[in-house]
Structure formats: C-alpha cells, structure tokens
Amino acid sequence: MQNSSLLKPPSIKAQHKIAKRRAVRRRRIDLNCGCSIFLHINCADNGFTHRGEHHCSSGREFRFYLGGSKSPIFQDTTRRGPVVHQNQDLPHPSPVQPQPTESIGSPQSLLQLPSLDDFDESFWADIFK
C-alpha cells in the first residue's frame, strides 16, 4: 500500500491538450458601423444591441471561404424579415461626445477663495522675509 502523500495530483496539461484540440466554432459578422463581432455557432437566432441598433444573428448572414482563409465571400440567403431594428428607447449615437459646459464660478467642492490682489503689501512682506 502506498502512502497517499507520495501520490501526485493529476497533471492539468492533459486536460489543456484535450481542450486545445477542438477549435471553438464561431462566425464573424461585419456590421454597417465597421465593427466586427464573432458569434458562437450554438448561439443561433439570438439578438443583441450595438450602438442603439438591434441586430438579429440569424442564418441570413454567414461567411464561407474559398481557397485561402483570407479570401472571404459573403453569401446572403433569402431574408425572412428585417434584421436591423431601430430601438427608439436608446439615444442615437453621435460621433462627437458632448462635453460639459465650463462654469465661471468656483467648483462646489472648493470654498470660495479670496483673490490674491485683495491682500495688502504688509501681508506679502511678512511671507517673503
């Protein structure tokens, strides 16, 4: 009978090797805004919202490759309905983010400080002696 302290735990390398064998199958979708998303194959017919537009990830859009992996050809099957919906509840995106207006007064977190011009000459003479 072997001592249990001499036994080594099973190596995690074997589990990693098995996990790396099978590549995650996903599909790339290029959106009109220039962004690209990758959808897992098992996530078919689910939707998502991106920049205020709702996208439906149905089987309408898919990419298949001829020749090398760098030569995509987009294939469109017949549409069942609209794929992109405008969400009225979300604000429409703007390429320029508005900046808050600057206030003239002092910030609320700081007390109102007196102007340095309000101090008389004797005050400055005492400081710089």
From Swiss-Prot:
GO cellular component, one term: viral capsid
A Pfam family this chain is assigned to: Gemini_AL2
Annotated consequence of substituting S109A: Strongly reduces phosphorylation
Keywords: Activator, DNA-binding, Host cytoplasm, Host nucleus, Host-virus interaction, Inhibition of host innate immune response by virus, Metal-binding, Phosphoprotein, Suppressor of RNA silencing, Viral immunoevasion, Zinc, Zinc-finger
Modified residues (Phosphoserine): S109
Positions of short motif Nuclear localization signal: 13-28
Biological process terms in GO annotation: symbiont-mediated suppression of host innate immune response
Localization of this protein: Host nucleus; Host cytoplasm
Region of interest (Transactivation), ranges: 115-129
Region (Disordered): 73-109
Start and end residues, zinc fingers (unnamed): 33-50
Post-translational modification, as annotated: Phosphorylated at Ser-109 by A.thaliana KIN10.
Entry annotated with the keyword Ion transport: no
Quaternary structure, from the entry: Monomer. Homodimer. Homooligomer. Self-interaction correlates with nuclear localization and efficient activation of transcription. Monomers suppress local silencing by interacting with and inactivating host adenosine kinase 2 (ADK2) in the cytoplasm. Interacts with and inhibits host SNF1 kinase. Binds to ssDNA.
Record remark on domains: The zinc finger and the transactivation region are involved in PTGS suppression.
Function statement: Strong activator of the late viral genes promoters. Enhances the expression of the capsid protein and nuclear shuttle protein. Acts as a suppressor of RNA-mediated gene silencing, also known as post-transcriptional gene silencing (PTGS), a mechanism of plant viral defense that limits the accumulation of viral RNAs. Suppresses the host RNA silencing by inhibiting adenosine kinase 2 (ADK2), a kinase involved in a general methylation pathway.
UniProt record similarity statement: Belongs to the geminiviridae transcriptional activator protein family.
Protein name per UniProt: Transcriptional activator protein
UniProt source species: Cabbage leaf curl virus (isolate Jamaica)
